[in-house]
Amino acid sequence: MLDTSIQALINKWQKYLVLQRNYSNHTVISYNNDLKHFLEFMNYYNSELVTINHIKTADIRLIRSWLAKRNCDNFTASSISRGLSAVKNFYRFLEKTTQLNSHIIFSIKSPKKTKLLPKALSEDDVVISLEHIEEYGNVKWIELRNKALLVLIYASGLRISEALSITKLHLQNLEFIRIIGKGSKERIIPWLPIAKNLITQYLEILPYKLGDNEPIFRGKQGKKLQPPVFNRELIKLKHFYGLPQHLTAHSFRHSFASHLLEHGADLRSLQELLGHKSLSTTQSYTKTSIKHLEAVYTTAYPIKK
């Protein structure tokens, strides 16, 4: 239960994240859940309904107690770090829009996250997926949608949220796609004919009329397709063909990067294609490729101990 004035602030903050910071719906939902968890803890901590004054005067003991509670509740370091980032983001918004001055929360450092290497699929698993994804959907246009979307992600390295934002306007350029990614960072990605041809075939039988600025990938009822819906299609594929547990829409983006590296792509070009702000993020794929080479070496090298 939240005070109505606080809920109004949260609503404004969410609009700010979407309209001015270009955050994805997925990120906004996650941030909102984290903030509400923090405010619920503040309710419990203060034994009364939280007001804007409670938020402004929250001290370091309260914030550290909340982080400790999340740790005791078995939240991962990554989830705890994201939660703290969400609350800090809300406080920054309050600085911009209210009389809140610099807050103690900005001095608290996030817990160190365990760095997990991106999990790519083997080239064989990608081929199996692309060949059989059309078997799921029950309706021809949905089957073709699934294949077009999966090929697009693997052929271009798009995030699922970026792929689901593709419109007819993106199709007008014959050579490249212009993508606005995380942090409003723009990048240009070459169109591969196979991806564009599949999308064209899909649009020819799509039973819904779309404007040039509307996302082309639609759900059964004609609304914009959402990531969880598409991932459910991939779960069916994964279970039936015994594909790796980490197979998701995002794993095809990882596979795009890893396979390009294995076939000789340079890191700087890959950084541009993936839309990474930092080269160090892209370098994580080199570790994945090295592990792949080690596995091949161990299995295939003729001289063994």
From Swiss-Prot:
PROSITE patterns: CB (PS51900), TYR_RECOMBINASE (PS51898)
Domain named Core-binding (CB): residues: 4-95
Domain of life: Bacteria
Active-site residues (renumbered): R159, K182, H250, R253, H276, Y285 (o-(3'-phospho-dna)-tyrosine intermediate)
Name of protein: Tyrosine recombinase XerC
Gene Ontology cellular-component terms listed: cytoplasm
UniProt GO BP: cell division; chromosome segregation; DNA transposition
Subunit structure: Forms a cyclic heterotetrameric complex composed of two molecules of XerC and two molecules of XerD.
Family: Belongs to the 'phage' integrase family. XerC subfamily.
SUPFAM superfamilies linked to this entry: DNA breaking-rejoining enzymes
TM ranges: none
